[in-house]
Amino acid sequence: MSGEKDRADTGLYCVFGNPVSHSRSPEIHHAFAAQHSDPVQYEKREAPLDDFAGAVQAFREAGGLGANVTVPFKEQAFALCDAITERADQAGAVNTLWWDGDQLHGDNTDGAGLVKDIRNNQGWTIRKKRVLILGAGGAVRGVLGPILAQEPTLLRIANRTKEKAEALAGNVMKGEGPPVLGGGLDNLMGQFDLVINAISAGLHGEMPALPDGLLAEGAVAYDMVYGSEPTPFMRWAEQQGAAATADGLGMLVEQAAEAFEIWRGWRPNTAPVMASLR
């Protein structure tokens, strides 16, 4: 890891995405760095859709030490790495890059960030709860391992195309772990204690139709999407009687803190940063 040894000089980092103009990552990482007067420069870089590898190489040549990766490049980042962590391997996607000599390393901090936000910031438990995840894209694949490590009673993945949800459930199902079930949104049944939305359409005001009665008494709802006001999914959950709802801003900050610690060798305090972003 790059860690403390880089701290004498300004460390150059970035977030790769396309589009990336909306990203709040520079704001977050500069706020982290300010906590210890750690000299960090963090910028947004829009990588061409057809040349992510070239963008990474150009950043390295410009003196870059590490990077975050957002949509749609996480799978490409995974393929580019010389070495990856176990949780990145599990996710099949990388959101955090750093160089050690000439070796490009990759990690996936999304699931750890989600679990930290749910447990530490929201004060919700996952252990022995019935968990429903809406969606089966890359965002879901990145968080399944850390959620299952919390030992829920069961985990159901529901997606518009049920085959994708079934395939994802089959990939992570382990004999000794909690049951992981996959299926379509149209035949979704049962009651759940924690519902997590990872359908990206939720950003633009379009939630798929969901049946009534999915939320058990005392259930909580978490949207991996975040915005300046409650998301359509959060509003749906409130109408369905959720005891509490949260958006994904805390996950964004917590996964960023995990990445920052890999790069700089110390862990920032996330609470004041979350408060300032609101």
Swiss-Prot record:
The active site is at residue 74. Pathway: Metabolic intermediate biosynthesis; chorismate biosynthesis; chorismate from D-erythrose 4-phosphate and phosphoenolpyruvate: step 4/7. Keywords: Amino-acid biosynthesis, Aromatic amino acid biosynthesis, NADP, Oxidoreductase. Shikimate binds at residues 23-25, 70, 95, 110, 226. The keyword Cell membrane does not apply. It catalyses: shikimate + NADP(+) = 3-dehydroshikimate + NADPH + H(+). GO terms for cellular component: cytosol. NADP(+) binds at residues 86, 135-139, 159-164, 224, 248. It is an enzyme of class 1 (oxidoreductase). Pfam families: SDH_C, Shikimate_DH, Shikimate_dh_N. Its EC number is 1.1.1.25. GO terms for biological process: amino acid biosynthetic process; aromatic amino acid family biosynthetic process; chorismate biosynthetic process; shikimate metabolic process. GO terms for molecular function: NADP binding; shikimate 3-dehydrogenase (NADP+) activity. Homodimer. Belongs to the shikimate dehydrogenase family. NCBIfam families: aroE, PRK00258.1-2. Involved in the biosynthesis of the chorismate, which leads to the biosynthesis of aromatic amino acids. Catalyzes the reversible NADPH linked reduction of 3-dehydroshikimate (DHSA) to yield shikimate (SA). This is Shikimate dehydrogenase (NADP(+)).
